[in-house]
């Protein structure tokens, strides 16, 4: 057995993150008294409390250790107050990820997440290790033998186009916000409002500008997220071996993903309006409770050979539409309600506060896009059995997920309301290892019967 090793000091951040709210209690008392002496007392109490928490974090860090023996058995030990030990074998892992954000890279640390077979996400093991220890642990638990590497080039261009479009839209919102912030001449409606009180005049002047600046903030945050995704597509490599799939890449933040081929629960090809325009389709792979944030790879039209090489057992759902007779309108509710509210506010603002109308049109348009996604789900969502495998389409937001279930352990659950039973429809839920659920809504009974029969034959 190898000697026991300690975690990286960044592991103490997990404890501090959960207890940092305790430091706000003295400040809350100072806020109630609202005096300088109370504030100084609260700051001294916060400093003492923070020192105590740092000391407790150091004790926890010293009391925790891990060891990996020659047989590939990982032992995690905690010896604070009570001794605990958890044992993990490499064969019992469905997937693992190695993440190195910029802060971790500067401090020589890595975050390793281990996903045991069949366990839910809350049972995943997160370790903060030194860079060399993390790489050694991954190579010992899930060794890579004779990998075949590919560098698909579809992800960078798709991320760049989205980032450019977001930049242009954010600039347009910024121009609108600056224009709304300028003093504008009072119309007859605004003049009538100005005679009420100062608060109404303030709202009539600054409410349009405030709403516009909120949209600018939302666009900026979304752009930062797209920029992060673009940085992660740099130096992107996907590989496969006889028993594993994986990917690695990133520029400022590095990541690596490894999954056992036999433990892949399903593969998911996501169709979105942007993907259809660029003809580049992201493919996500889920193994147990491991749901990576980034796709395994992005392929474009004409690269189906790469798809078949990486996922030879994948089958696309058939290009047919399910029966739409008496189908539920549940697909339109998540986006239809915000769209109706935004549209109502637009109509009201035209007579009450015209300066706010243009700003309100933007969330209305966004809600309309999501409503179009709901229409796509209403038209296309369904489940089919192809070559003994469950294939399904399900809609979520603006994405249409084309899924092929690859794991043999599948449970089905049906749900029927009285209205659905009258029209021979039901909602079918697929349960996969790791407490993963896939729901297909309002499908005809005749489409679900072959799937139920296939599960009964397996049992």
Q: What kind of region is each of these model predictions?
A:
Residues 1-459:
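N-terminal basic, Ser/Thr-rich segments that initiate or prime the first beta/alpha elements at protein or domain
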């Amino acid at each position: 057995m190898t000697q026991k090793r300690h975690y990286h000091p960044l592991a103490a951040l997990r404890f501090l993150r959960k207890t940092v709210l305790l430091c706000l209690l003295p400040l809350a008392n100072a806020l109630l008294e609202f005096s300088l002496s109370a504030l100084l007392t609260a700051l001294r109490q916060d400093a003492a409390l923070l020192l105590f928490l740092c000391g407790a974090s150091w004790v926890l860090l010293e009391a925790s250790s891990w060891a990996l023996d020659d047989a590939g058995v990982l032992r995690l030990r905690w010896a604070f107050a009570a001794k605990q030990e958890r044992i993990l074998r490499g064969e019992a892992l469905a997937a693992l990820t190695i993440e190195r954000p910029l802060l971790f890279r500067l401090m020589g640390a890595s975050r390793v997440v281990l996903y045991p077979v069949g366990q839910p996400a809350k049972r995943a093991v997160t370790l903060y290790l030194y860079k060399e220890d993390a790489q050694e642990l991954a190579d010992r638990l899930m060794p890579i033998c004779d990998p075949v590497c590919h560098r698909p080039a579809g992800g960078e261009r798709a991320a760049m186009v989205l980032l450019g479009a977001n930049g242009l839209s954010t600039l347009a919102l910024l121009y609108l916000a600056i224009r709304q912030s300028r003093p504008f001449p009072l119309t007859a409606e605004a003049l009538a409002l100005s005679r009420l009180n100062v608060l109404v005049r303030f709202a009539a002047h600054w409410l349009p500008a405030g709403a516009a600046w909120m949209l600018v903030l939302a666009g900026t945050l979304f752009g930062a997220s797209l920029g992060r995704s673009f940085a992660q597509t740099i130096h992107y490599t996907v590989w496969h071996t006889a028993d594993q799939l994986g990917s690695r890449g990133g520029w400022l933040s590095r990541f690596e993903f490894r999954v056992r081929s036999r433990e892949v629960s399903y593969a998911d090809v996501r169709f979105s309006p942007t993907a259809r325009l660029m003809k580049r389709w992201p493919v996500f792979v889920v193994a147990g409770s491991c749901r990576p944030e980034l796709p395994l790879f992005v392929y474009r039209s004409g690269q189906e050979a790469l798809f078949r090489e990486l996922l030879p057992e994948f089958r696309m759902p058939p290009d047919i539409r399910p029966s739409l007779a008496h189908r539920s309108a549940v697909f339109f509710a998540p986006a239809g309600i915000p769209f109706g509210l935004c549209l109502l506010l637009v109509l009201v603002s035209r007579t009450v506060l015209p300066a706010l109308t243009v700003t309100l049109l933007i969330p209305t348009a966004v809600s309309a896009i999501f409503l179009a996604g709901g229409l796509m789900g209403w038209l296309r969502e369904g489940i089919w059995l192809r070559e003994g495998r469950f294939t399904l389409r399900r809609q979520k937001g603006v994405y249409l997920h084309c899924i092929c279930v690859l794991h043999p352990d599948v449970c089905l659950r049906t749900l029927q309301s009285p209205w659905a039973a009258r029209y021979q429809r039901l909602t079918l839920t697929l349960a996969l290892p790791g407490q993963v659920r896939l729901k297909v809504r309002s499908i005809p009974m005749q489409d679900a019967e072959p799937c139920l029969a296939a599960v009964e034959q397996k049992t």
